[in-house]
Regions:
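Hydrophobic alpha-helical transmembrane signal-anchor segments
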Residues: 1-18
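Small/polar-residue-rich segments within soluble enzyme cores
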Residues: 10, 51-54, 60-61, 65, ...
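Short, basic/aromatic recognition patches
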Residues: 18-33, 207-222, 267
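Second-shell loop/turn segments in exported
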Residues: 26-30, 57-69, 76-80, 98-106, ...
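Short extracytoplasmic
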Residues: 26-54
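Short, small/polar residue-rich loop motifs at catalytic or cofactor-binding pockets
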Residues: 32-36, 222-226, 297, 413
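Beta-lactam-recognizing serine transpeptidase/beta-lactamase-like catalytic domain environment
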Residues: 176-190, 194, 229-274, 279-514, ...
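Conserved, well-ordered alpha-helix/loop/beta-strand core segments that scaffold catalytic motifs
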Residues: 183-227
Length: 557
Protein backbone atom coordinates (compact mmCIF):
# COMPACT_ATOMS: atom_id res chain seq x y z
CA UNK A 1 0.00 0.00 0.00
CA UNK A 2 1.43 3.41 -0.98
CA UNK A 3 2.20 5.91 1.79
CA UNK A 4 -0.41 8.50 0.70
CA UNK A 5 -3.13 5.88 0.24
CA UNK A 6 -2.31 4.32 3.62
CA UNK A 7 -2.55 7.72 5.40
CA UNK A 8 -5.85 8.57 3.66
CA UNK A 9 -7.30 5.15 4.65
CA UNK A 10 -6.16 5.64 8.24
CA UNK A 11 -7.78 9.08 8.46
CA UNK A 12 -10.99 7.73 6.91
CA UNK A 13 -11.17 4.87 9.46
CA UNK A 14 -10.27 7.11 12.38
CA UNK A 15 -7.13 5.13 13.29
CA UNK A 16 -4.74 6.94 15.64
CA UNK A 17 -1.08 7.44 14.83
CA UNK A 18 -0.07 4.73 17.34
CA UNK A 19 -2.52 2.22 15.90
CA UNK A 20 -1.42 3.16 12.39
CA UNK A 21 2.07 2.08 13.44
CA UNK A 22 0.77 -1.30 14.71
CA UNK A 23 -1.16 -1.89 11.50
CA UNK A 24 1.92 -1.06 9.48
CA UNK A 25 3.82 -3.79 11.33
CA UNK A 26 1.40 -6.59 10.50
CA UNK A 27 3.34 -9.81 9.91
CA UNK A 28 2.85 -13.52 9.43
CA UNK A 29 3.81 -15.88 12.27
CA UNK A 30 3.81 -19.63 12.88
CA UNK A 31 2.98 -21.26 16.20
CA UNK A 32 3.40 -24.94 17.02
CA UNK A 33 0.61 -26.59 18.98
CA UNK A 34 2.04 -28.98 21.54
CA UNK A 35 0.84 -32.54 21.17
CA UNK A 36 -0.34 -34.71 24.04
CA UNK A 37 1.35 -38.01 24.75
CA UNK A 38 -0.76 -41.15 25.05
CA UNK A 39 -1.61 -42.62 28.43
CA UNK A 40 -0.41 -45.90 29.90
CA UNK A 41 -2.93 -48.19 31.61
CA UNK A 42 -2.61 -51.41 33.57
CA UNK A 43 -4.38 -54.59 32.49
CA UNK A 44 -6.84 -54.96 35.36
CA UNK A 45 -10.59 -54.62 34.97
CA UNK A 46 -10.34 -51.07 36.32
CA UNK A 47 -7.80 -50.00 33.67
CA UNK A 48 -5.85 -47.88 36.16
CA UNK A 49 -3.92 -44.93 34.74
CA UNK A 50 -0.17 -45.35 35.22
CA UNK A 51 1.11 -42.38 33.18
CA UNK A 52 -0.55 -39.31 31.69
CA UNK A 53 0.09 -35.74 30.54
CA UNK A 54 -0.91 -32.80 32.75
CA UNK A 55 -1.56 -29.30 31.40
CA UNK A 56 0.96 -26.89 32.92
CA UNK A 57 2.53 -23.52 32.14
CA UNK A 58 6.08 -22.46 31.38
CA UNK A 59 7.16 -19.00 32.50
CA UNK A 60 8.69 -17.10 29.57
CA UNK A 61 10.56 -13.80 29.78
CA UNK A 62 11.68 -11.06 27.40
CA UNK A 63 14.84 -9.93 29.24
CA UNK A 64 15.21 -6.83 27.07
CA UNK A 65 11.86 -5.45 28.32
CA UNK A 66 12.74 -6.13 31.96
CA UNK A 67 16.08 -4.39 31.58
CA UNK A 68 14.59 -1.45 29.68
CA UNK A 69 12.00 -0.93 32.45
CA UNK A 70 14.55 -1.47 35.23
CA UNK A 71 12.42 -4.33 36.67
CA UNK A 72 14.99 -7.11 36.61
CA UNK A 73 15.48 -7.31 40.38
CA UNK A 74 11.77 -6.95 41.12
CA UNK A 75 10.87 -9.72 38.68
CA UNK A 76 13.60 -11.96 40.07
CA UNK A 77 12.44 -11.54 43.65
CA UNK A 78 8.73 -12.01 42.95
CA UNK A 79 9.06 -14.98 40.57
CA UNK A 80 11.47 -16.78 42.91
CA UNK A 81 9.04 -16.37 45.81
CA UNK A 82 6.00 -17.64 43.89
CA UNK A 83 7.81 -20.51 42.16
CA UNK A 84 9.83 -21.55 45.19
CA UNK A 85 13.12 -21.12 43.33
CA UNK A 86 16.48 -19.74 44.31
CA UNK A 87 16.80 -16.06 43.34
CA UNK A 88 20.21 -16.67 41.79
CA UNK A 89 18.69 -19.28 39.48
CA UNK A 90 15.94 -16.90 38.34
CA UNK A 91 18.40 -14.04 37.92
CA UNK A 92 20.59 -16.26 35.75
CA UNK A 93 17.67 -16.81 33.39
CA UNK A 94 16.59 -13.14 33.28
CA UNK A 95 19.85 -11.19 33.27
CA UNK A 96 20.64 -11.63 29.60
CA UNK A 97 21.09 -8.26 27.88
CA UNK A 98 20.11 -8.26 24.23
CA UNK A 99 18.03 -11.44 24.53
CA UNK A 100 14.33 -11.41 23.66
CA UNK A 101 13.50 -14.89 24.96
CA UNK A 102 14.29 -16.88 28.09
CA UNK A 103 12.47 -19.75 29.80
CA UNK A 104 12.49 -18.96 33.50
CA UNK A 105 10.81 -22.09 34.87
CA UNK A 106 8.79 -25.04 33.66
CA UNK A 107 5.76 -27.08 34.65
CA UNK A 108 3.93 -24.52 36.77
CA UNK A 109 0.66 -25.80 38.23
CA UNK A 110 -2.55 -23.75 38.10
CA UNK A 111 -2.17 -21.89 41.40
CA UNK A 112 1.45 -20.96 40.76
CA UNK A 113 0.86 -19.90 37.18
CA UNK A 114 -2.10 -17.71 38.19
CA UNK A 115 0.06 -16.11 40.88
CA UNK A 116 2.71 -15.35 38.27
CA UNK A 117 0.07 -13.85 35.99
CA UNK A 118 -1.28 -11.71 38.84
CA UNK A 119 2.15 -10.15 39.35
CA UNK A 120 1.53 -8.16 36.17
CA UNK A 121 5.22 -8.02 35.28
CA UNK A 122 5.98 -6.51 31.89
CA UNK A 123 8.05 -8.88 29.77
CA UNK A 124 6.80 -11.98 31.61
CA UNK A 125 4.29 -14.33 29.98
CA UNK A 126 2.95 -17.87 30.40
CA UNK A 127 3.08 -20.52 27.72
CA UNK A 128 0.93 -23.66 27.57
CA UNK A 129 2.89 -26.88 28.10
CA UNK A 130 2.41 -30.46 29.24
CA UNK A 131 4.13 -32.43 31.96
CA UNK A 132 4.38 -36.21 32.17
CA UNK A 133 2.94 -37.36 35.45
CA UNK A 134 3.05 -40.73 37.19
CA UNK A 135 0.24 -40.98 39.78
CA UNK A 136 1.85 -43.83 41.73
CA UNK A 137 5.40 -42.44 41.96
CA UNK A 138 7.77 -45.44 42.32
CA UNK A 139 5.11 -48.11 41.80
CA UNK A 140 5.84 -50.25 38.71
CA UNK A 141 8.63 -47.79 37.89
CA UNK A 142 10.92 -50.18 36.00
CA UNK A 143 8.17 -51.31 33.66
CA UNK A 144 6.56 -47.92 33.02
CA UNK A 145 9.82 -46.00 32.58
CA UNK A 146 10.09 -42.23 32.35
CA UNK A 147 10.07 -39.36 29.87
CA UNK A 148 13.42 -37.55 29.72
CA UNK A 149 13.99 -33.80 29.48
CA UNK A 150 13.83 -33.92 25.70
CA UNK A 151 10.35 -35.42 25.76
CA UNK A 152 11.55 -38.86 24.68
CA UNK A 153 10.99 -42.11 26.57
CA UNK A 154 14.08 -42.88 28.64
CA UNK A 155 13.33 -46.43 29.80
CA UNK A 156 10.60 -49.04 30.13
CA UNK A 157 7.37 -48.81 28.16
CA UNK A 158 7.87 -45.06 27.73
CA UNK A 159 10.98 -45.86 25.70
CA UNK A 160 9.96 -49.11 24.04
CA UNK A 161 6.59 -47.78 22.85
CA UNK A 162 7.70 -44.19 22.30
CA UNK A 163 6.74 -44.31 18.62
CA UNK A 164 3.12 -45.06 19.54
CA UNK A 165 2.89 -42.85 22.63
CA UNK A 166 4.18 -39.64 21.11
CA UNK A 167 1.66 -37.49 19.31
CA UNK A 168 2.07 -35.12 16.39
CA UNK A 169 2.33 -31.35 16.96
CA UNK A 170 -0.16 -29.04 15.30
CA UNK A 171 0.53 -25.79 13.46
CA UNK A 172 -1.18 -22.42 13.40
CA UNK A 173 0.02 -20.00 10.72
CA UNK A 174 -1.61 -16.62 11.13
CA UNK A 175 -1.12 -12.86 11.08
CA UNK A 176 -0.40 -10.59 14.08
CA UNK A 177 -0.29 -6.84 14.39
CA UNK A 178 2.45 -4.77 15.97
CA UNK A 179 1.21 -5.64 19.44
CA UNK A 180 1.41 -9.35 18.55
CA UNK A 181 -2.37 -9.63 18.59
CA UNK A 182 -3.58 -12.35 16.27
CA UNK A 183 -5.91 -11.34 13.45
CA UNK A 184 -8.08 -14.46 13.53
CA UNK A 185 -9.82 -13.73 10.25
CA UNK A 186 -6.42 -13.77 8.53
CA UNK A 187 -5.40 -17.28 9.71
CA UNK A 188 -3.55 -19.13 6.93
CA UNK A 189 -3.31 -22.65 8.42
CA UNK A 190 -4.85 -24.32 11.45
CA UNK A 191 -3.67 -27.93 11.82
CA UNK A 192 -4.70 -29.40 15.20
CA UNK A 193 -2.24 -31.39 17.29
CA UNK A 194 -2.76 -35.16 17.37
CA UNK A 195 -2.69 -37.03 20.66
CA UNK A 196 -0.51 -40.13 20.88
CA UNK A 197 -1.86 -43.66 21.25
CA UNK A 198 -2.72 -45.21 24.61
CA UNK A 199 -0.85 -48.31 25.81
CA UNK A 200 -2.65 -51.01 27.77
CA UNK A 201 -0.34 -53.38 29.64
CA UNK A 202 -0.76 -57.01 30.62
CA UNK A 203 0.36 -56.12 34.15
CA UNK A 204 -2.35 -56.10 36.77
CA UNK A 205 -1.94 -53.34 39.34
CA UNK A 206 -3.30 -55.55 42.13
CA UNK A 207 -0.88 -58.44 41.49
CA UNK A 208 1.92 -55.92 41.04
CA UNK A 209 1.16 -54.56 44.48
CA UNK A 210 1.36 -58.07 45.93
CA UNK A 211 4.76 -58.57 44.29
CA UNK A 212 6.19 -55.22 45.36
CA UNK A 213 5.02 -55.62 48.94
CA UNK A 214 6.63 -59.07 49.12
CA UNK A 215 9.90 -57.66 47.75
CA UNK A 216 9.94 -54.87 50.31
CA UNK A 217 9.52 -57.45 53.08
CA UNK A 218 12.38 -59.55 51.67
CA UNK A 219 14.67 -56.53 51.41
CA UNK A 220 13.96 -55.51 54.99
CA UNK A 221 14.09 -58.98 56.53
CA UNK A 222 17.26 -60.14 54.80
CA UNK A 223 19.16 -56.88 54.28
CA UNK A 224 19.54 -57.71 50.61
CA UNK A 225 21.40 -55.68 48.01
CA UNK A 226 18.53 -56.18 45.57
CA UNK A 227 15.49 -58.34 44.86
CA UNK A 228 13.15 -58.90 41.92
CA UNK A 229 10.07 -60.88 40.96
CA UNK A 230 8.08 -61.76 37.84
CA UNK A 231 4.64 -63.35 37.52
CA UNK A 232 3.75 -64.88 34.14
CA UNK A 233 0.76 -66.74 32.72
CA UNK A 234 2.27 -70.07 31.68
CA UNK A 235 -0.05 -70.72 28.71
CA UNK A 236 0.21 -67.31 27.05
CA UNK A 237 3.42 -65.61 28.15
CA UNK A 238 1.53 -62.59 29.52
CA UNK A 239 3.45 -60.86 32.29
CA UNK A 240 1.05 -59.88 35.08
CA UNK A 241 3.66 -58.51 37.50
CA UNK A 242 7.29 -57.44 37.28
CA UNK A 243 9.07 -55.64 40.09
CA UNK A 244 12.64 -54.82 41.03
CA UNK A 245 14.38 -53.37 44.07
CA UNK A 246 15.87 -50.88 44.67
CA UNK A 247 13.38 -48.60 42.94
CA UNK A 248 12.97 -44.87 42.24
CA UNK A 249 10.33 -42.15 41.93
CA UNK A 250 9.25 -41.72 38.30
CA UNK A 251 8.36 -38.09 39.01
CA UNK A 252 11.92 -37.44 40.17
CA UNK A 253 13.95 -39.83 38.01
CA UNK A 254 16.87 -37.40 37.84
CA UNK A 255 17.67 -38.17 41.48
CA UNK A 256 17.89 -41.94 40.87
CA UNK A 257 21.20 -43.83 40.84
CA UNK A 258 22.12 -46.36 38.16
CA UNK A 259 21.44 -49.14 40.67
CA UNK A 260 17.92 -47.83 41.23
CA UNK A 261 17.24 -47.35 37.51
CA UNK A 262 18.17 -50.94 36.63
CA UNK A 263 15.29 -53.33 35.96
CA UNK A 264 16.89 -56.43 37.42
CA UNK A 265 14.10 -58.69 36.18
CA UNK A 266 15.42 -58.41 32.62
CA UNK A 267 18.68 -56.47 32.91
CA UNK A 268 20.60 -58.29 35.66
CA UNK A 269 22.56 -61.39 34.65
CA UNK A 270 23.44 -63.95 37.33
CA UNK A 271 24.50 -67.58 37.67
CA UNK A 272 21.25 -69.42 38.46
CA UNK A 273 22.65 -72.25 40.55
CA UNK A 274 20.31 -75.15 41.24
CA UNK A 275 17.27 -73.77 39.41
CA UNK A 276 19.14 -74.79 36.24
CA UNK A 277 18.86 -78.44 37.33
CA UNK A 278 15.20 -78.45 36.30
CA UNK A 279 16.24 -77.85 32.69
CA UNK A 280 19.24 -80.17 32.55
CA UNK A 281 17.39 -83.07 34.18
CA UNK A 282 14.46 -82.47 31.81
CA UNK A 283 16.92 -82.76 28.93
CA UNK A 284 18.34 -86.03 30.28
CA UNK A 285 14.85 -87.51 30.68
CA UNK A 286 13.81 -86.34 27.24
CA UNK A 287 16.86 -88.07 25.71
CA UNK A 288 16.12 -91.21 27.76
CA UNK A 289 19.48 -91.03 29.49
CA UNK A 290 17.55 -92.01 32.61
CA UNK A 291 14.04 -92.38 33.97
CA UNK A 292 12.54 -90.96 37.13
CA UNK A 293 13.29 -94.17 39.07
CA UNK A 294 16.84 -94.61 37.77
CA UNK A 295 19.28 -94.81 40.71
CA UNK A 296 22.60 -92.94 40.71
CA UNK A 297 25.44 -93.05 43.20
CA UNK A 298 25.88 -89.59 44.71
CA UNK A 299 29.23 -90.57 46.21
CA UNK A 300 28.43 -89.59 49.81
CA UNK A 301 28.75 -85.90 48.95
CA UNK A 302 32.09 -85.72 47.08
CA UNK A 303 32.77 -86.73 43.47
CA UNK A 304 36.13 -86.46 41.74
CA UNK A 305 35.52 -85.71 38.06
CA UNK A 306 38.15 -84.60 35.54
CA UNK A 307 40.54 -83.78 38.36
CA UNK A 308 38.06 -81.54 40.21
CA UNK A 309 35.95 -82.41 43.24
CA UNK A 310 32.24 -81.63 43.09
CA UNK A 311 30.38 -81.57 46.40
CA UNK A 312 26.78 -81.75 47.57
CA UNK A 313 25.39 -79.43 50.24
CA UNK A 314 24.42 -82.57 52.16
CA UNK A 315 26.09 -85.96 51.56
CA UNK A 316 23.93 -88.54 49.80
CA UNK A 317 24.53 -92.12 48.76
CA UNK A 318 22.23 -93.68 46.17
CA UNK A 319 19.34 -91.51 44.94
CA UNK A 320 16.70 -91.92 42.28
CA UNK A 321 16.40 -89.18 39.68
CA UNK A 322 13.20 -88.10 41.44
CA UNK A 323 15.10 -87.67 44.70
CA UNK A 324 18.00 -85.93 42.95
CA UNK A 325 15.49 -83.24 41.99
CA UNK A 326 13.87 -83.18 45.42
CA UNK A 327 17.17 -83.04 47.34
CA UNK A 328 18.89 -80.84 44.73
CA UNK A 329 21.95 -83.07 44.42
CA UNK A 330 24.80 -81.48 42.47
CA UNK A 331 26.53 -84.81 41.96
CA UNK A 332 23.45 -86.67 40.77
CA UNK A 333 22.59 -83.90 38.29
CA UNK A 334 26.18 -83.62 37.06
CA UNK A 335 26.36 -87.35 36.37
CA UNK A 336 23.21 -87.06 34.27
CA UNK A 337 24.52 -84.11 32.25
CA UNK A 338 27.89 -85.80 31.68
CA UNK A 339 26.01 -88.81 30.30
CA UNK A 340 23.91 -86.47 28.17
CA UNK A 341 27.02 -84.82 26.72
CA UNK A 342 28.03 -81.22 26.11
CA UNK A 343 26.47 -80.88 22.68
CA UNK A 344 23.06 -82.17 23.73
CA UNK A 345 23.08 -80.16 26.96
CA UNK A 346 23.85 -77.00 25.02
CA UNK A 347 21.11 -77.76 22.48
CA UNK A 348 18.46 -78.26 25.14
CA UNK A 349 19.39 -75.16 27.12
CA UNK A 350 19.22 -73.18 23.89
CA UNK A 351 15.77 -74.62 23.19
CA UNK A 352 14.66 -73.45 26.62
CA UNK A 353 15.87 -69.95 25.73
CA UNK A 354 19.09 -69.82 27.74
CA UNK A 355 21.68 -67.55 26.13
CA UNK A 356 19.13 -65.61 24.04
CA UNK A 357 16.82 -62.70 24.69
CA UNK A 358 13.22 -63.75 25.21
CA UNK A 359 12.01 -60.99 22.90
CA UNK A 360 9.81 -59.30 25.50
CA UNK A 361 8.53 -55.89 24.38
CA UNK A 362 10.63 -53.96 26.90
CA UNK A 363 14.00 -52.29 26.30
CA UNK A 364 17.04 -53.22 28.37
CA UNK A 365 16.80 -57.01 28.20
CA UNK A 366 20.11 -58.87 28.52
CA UNK A 367 20.69 -62.17 26.72
CA UNK A 368 22.66 -63.94 29.43
CA UNK A 369 25.71 -66.11 28.77
CA UNK A 370 25.81 -69.61 27.33
CA UNK A 371 29.18 -70.09 25.65
CA UNK A 372 29.50 -72.18 22.47
CA UNK A 373 30.47 -75.79 23.21
CA UNK A 374 33.88 -75.25 21.59
CA UNK A 375 34.72 -72.93 24.49
CA UNK A 376 33.67 -75.37 27.22
CA UNK A 377 36.34 -76.85 29.48
CA UNK A 378 36.59 -80.51 30.46
CA UNK A 379 34.37 -79.86 33.52
CA UNK A 380 31.86 -77.45 31.91
CA UNK A 381 29.31 -80.17 31.19
CA UNK A 382 29.18 -81.15 34.86
CA UNK A 383 29.03 -77.53 36.07
CA UNK A 384 26.71 -75.82 33.58
CA UNK A 385 24.01 -78.40 34.29
CA UNK A 386 23.97 -77.32 37.94
CA UNK A 387 23.93 -73.61 37.10
CA UNK A 388 27.61 -72.66 37.22
CA UNK A 389 29.51 -71.21 34.27
CA UNK A 390 26.24 -70.07 32.70
CA UNK A 391 24.35 -66.83 33.32
CA UNK A 392 20.69 -65.96 32.92
CA UNK A 393 18.14 -63.26 33.53
CA UNK A 394 15.20 -63.95 35.82
CA UNK A 395 12.84 -63.70 32.85
CA UNK A 396 14.79 -66.37 30.94
CA UNK A 397 14.71 -68.71 33.92
CA UNK A 398 11.01 -68.18 34.56
CA UNK A 399 10.06 -68.54 30.91
CA UNK A 400 11.98 -71.83 30.73
CA UNK A 401 10.14 -73.22 33.78
CA UNK A 402 6.86 -72.04 32.27
CA UNK A 403 7.68 -74.21 29.24
CA UNK A 404 7.72 -77.25 31.53
CA UNK A 405 4.36 -76.11 32.90
CA UNK A 406 3.11 -75.59 29.33
CA UNK A 407 3.66 -79.18 28.14
CA UNK A 408 7.17 -78.40 26.87
CA UNK A 409 6.29 -75.41 24.66
CA UNK A 410 8.25 -72.16 25.08
CA UNK A 411 6.17 -68.98 24.75
CA UNK A 412 7.40 -65.47 24.03
CA UNK A 413 6.65 -63.28 27.05
CA UNK A 414 4.94 -59.97 26.43
CA UNK A 415 3.87 -56.96 28.44
CA UNK A 416 1.83 -54.81 26.03
CA UNK A 417 -1.75 -56.00 25.67
CA UNK A 418 -3.09 -53.35 23.31
CA UNK A 419 -2.24 -50.07 21.60
CA UNK A 420 -5.23 -47.83 20.85
CA UNK A 421 -5.10 -44.61 18.81
CA UNK A 422 -6.69 -41.38 20.04
CA UNK A 423 -9.67 -42.04 17.74
CA UNK A 424 -10.22 -45.57 19.08
CA UNK A 425 -8.48 -47.68 16.43
CA UNK A 426 -6.57 -50.71 17.75
CA UNK A 427 -3.07 -50.34 16.28
CA UNK A 428 -1.48 -53.35 17.95
CA UNK A 429 -2.67 -56.27 20.02
CA UNK A 430 -0.41 -58.54 22.04
CA UNK A 431 -1.07 -62.21 21.42
CA UNK A 432 0.43 -65.49 22.64
CA UNK A 433 3.24 -66.69 20.40
CA UNK A 434 4.93 -70.08 20.50
CA UNK A 435 8.72 -69.90 20.16
CA UNK A 436 9.28 -73.64 19.91
CA UNK A 437 9.20 -76.95 21.74
CA UNK A 438 11.91 -77.63 24.32
CA UNK A 439 10.85 -81.11 25.49
CA UNK A 440 8.03 -83.54 24.80
CA UNK A 441 4.71 -83.21 26.60
CA UNK A 442 5.40 -86.57 28.28
CA UNK A 443 8.72 -85.36 29.68
CA UNK A 444 7.09 -82.10 30.78
CA UNK A 445 4.44 -84.07 32.66
CA UNK A 446 7.09 -86.13 34.47
CA UNK A 447 9.06 -82.98 35.34
CA UNK A 448 5.97 -81.31 36.80
CA UNK A 449 5.55 -84.30 39.10
CA UNK A 450 9.22 -84.26 40.11
CA UNK A 451 9.25 -80.51 40.72
CA UNK A 452 6.11 -80.74 42.86
CA UNK A 453 8.05 -83.06 45.22
CA UNK A 454 10.54 -80.22 45.87
CA UNK A 455 7.92 -78.48 48.02
CA UNK A 456 6.89 -81.63 49.88
CA UNK A 457 8.36 -82.79 53.19
CA UNK A 458 12.07 -83.50 52.79
CA UNK A 459 12.41 -81.22 49.75
CA UNK A 460 14.40 -77.99 49.57
CA UNK A 461 11.38 -75.78 48.81
CA UNK A 462 8.87 -76.56 51.55
CA UNK A 463 8.51 -72.86 52.40
CA UNK A 464 7.09 -72.20 48.93
CA UNK A 465 3.97 -74.23 49.66
CA UNK A 466 0.51 -72.69 49.29
CA UNK A 467 -2.47 -73.86 51.31
CA UNK A 468 -4.81 -76.14 49.33
CA UNK A 469 -2.71 -75.94 46.15
CA UNK A 470 0.15 -78.09 44.89
CA UNK A 471 3.30 -76.14 44.06
CA UNK A 472 6.04 -77.18 41.62
CA UNK A 473 9.37 -75.43 41.58
CA UNK A 474 13.07 -75.36 42.23
CA UNK A 475 15.28 -73.61 44.74
CA UNK A 476 18.53 -71.93 43.78
CA UNK A 477 21.47 -70.86 45.92
CA UNK A 478 24.38 -69.61 43.83
CA UNK A 479 27.73 -68.29 44.96
CA UNK A 480 28.58 -65.09 43.10
CA UNK A 481 31.64 -65.38 40.85
CA UNK A 482 34.67 -63.24 41.76
CA UNK A 483 38.21 -63.10 40.36
CA UNK A 484 38.01 -66.42 38.53
CA UNK A 485 36.47 -68.20 41.52
CA UNK A 486 33.42 -67.98 43.74
CA UNK A 487 32.66 -65.84 46.78
CA UNK A 488 32.25 -67.58 50.12
CA UNK A 489 29.96 -64.83 51.46
CA UNK A 490 27.98 -63.35 48.53
CA UNK A 491 25.07 -65.39 47.18
CA UNK A 492 22.07 -65.08 44.88
CA UNK A 493 19.06 -66.90 46.34
CA UNK A 494 16.06 -67.78 44.19
CA UNK A 495 12.93 -69.83 43.83
CA UNK A 496 11.16 -70.40 40.53
CA UNK A 497 8.01 -72.43 40.05
CA UNK A 498 4.40 -72.61 38.98
CA UNK A 499 0.96 -73.08 40.50
CA UNK A 500 -1.13 -75.13 40.65
CA UNK A 501 1.34 -77.90 39.85
CA UNK A 502 -1.48 -80.17 38.64
CA UNK A 503 -3.01 -77.60 36.25
CA UNK A 504 -0.48 -74.76 35.91
CA UNK A 505 -1.74 -71.20 35.51
CA UNK A 506 0.91 -68.88 36.95
CA UNK A 507 4.70 -69.03 36.87
CA UNK A 508 6.58 -67.00 39.48
CA UNK A 509 10.25 -66.31 40.11
CA UNK A 510 11.75 -64.55 43.13
CA UNK A 511 15.46 -63.64 43.11
CA UNK A 512 17.33 -62.06 46.02
CA UNK A 513 20.83 -60.62 45.65
CA UNK A 514 23.24 -60.96 48.59
CA UNK A 515 20.80 -61.66 51.43
CA UNK A 516 22.33 -61.64 54.92
CA UNK A 517 23.01 -63.68 56.96
CA UNK A 518 20.81 -66.52 55.65
CA UNK A 519 21.32 -67.04 51.95
CA UNK A 520 19.59 -70.18 50.63
CA UNK A 521 16.78 -69.99 48.11
CA UNK A 522 14.55 -72.23 50.19
CA UNK A 523 14.79 -69.91 53.20
CA UNK A 524 15.05 -66.47 51.57
CA UNK A 525 13.11 -66.59 48.28
CA UNK A 526 10.61 -69.44 48.73
CA UNK A 527 8.49 -67.68 51.41
CA UNK A 528 8.04 -64.66 49.14
CA UNK A 529 6.99 -67.01 46.33
CA UNK A 530 4.41 -68.56 48.65
CA UNK A 531 2.99 -65.18 49.65
CA UNK A 532 2.66 -63.91 46.08
CA UNK A 533 1.28 -67.21 44.77
CA UNK A 534 -1.31 -67.49 47.52
CA UNK A 535 -2.60 -63.95 46.99
CA UNK A 536 -2.55 -64.18 43.18
CA UNK A 537 -4.41 -67.50 43.12
CA UNK A 538 -7.11 -65.99 45.30
CA UNK A 539 -7.26 -62.76 43.28
CA UNK A 540 -7.64 -64.57 39.96
CA UNK A 541 -10.10 -66.99 41.55
CA UNK A 542 -8.14 -69.98 40.27
CA UNK A 543 -9.97 -73.07 41.55
CA UNK A 544 -8.39 -75.67 43.76
CA UNK A 545 -7.64 -78.68 41.50
CA UNK A 546 -9.81 -81.74 42.10
CA UNK A 547 -8.93 -85.41 41.82
CA UNK A 548 -10.98 -87.74 39.63
CA UNK A 549 -13.71 -88.47 42.20
CA UNK A 550 -14.49 -84.74 42.42
CA UNK A 551 -13.03 -84.07 45.88
CA UNK A 552 -10.57 -81.27 46.48
CA UNK A 553 -6.89 -82.06 46.84
CA UNK A 554 -5.88 -81.94 50.48
CA UNK A 555 -3.91 -79.02 51.82
CA UNK A 556 -0.15 -79.26 51.48
CA UNK A 557 0.20 -77.81 54.96
Amino acid sequence: MGGLAYRLLSLHLGISATDRDHVARIRRVERLLRERRGRIYDGSRDANILALDLEVKDVIADPSILLANNELELATEQIAEVAGLDEAEVMGALDRPGRRYARVCRNMQDEQSEAIRDLGLRGISLRDATKRYYPHNSFMCHVIGFLNGEGVGGSGVEQGMNGFLRGCPGLVESVVDGRRRELYDRRVQDIPAKTGADICLTLDQNVQYMAERALDEVMERHGAKGAWVIVERVRTGEIVAMASRPSYDLNDFGAASQEELLNRAIGFVYEPGSTMKALSIAAALNERIAERDTILNCEDGAWLHQGKVLRDYHPYGRLTVADIVKKSSNIGTAKLTVSLGAQKLSEYLTRFGIGSKTGIDLPGEEQGILHPVRRWSRISCSRIGIGQGVSVTALQMLNALCAIANDGVVMRPYIVSRVVSSDGVVLHEGRPKEVGRAISSQTASIMRQLLSRVTEAGGTGTRARVRNYSVAGKTGTAQKPIDGGYSSSAYVASFVGFVPADAPELGIIVVVDEPQPLHTGGVVAAPAFSTIASEALSYFDIPVPRIHDGTEIASTH
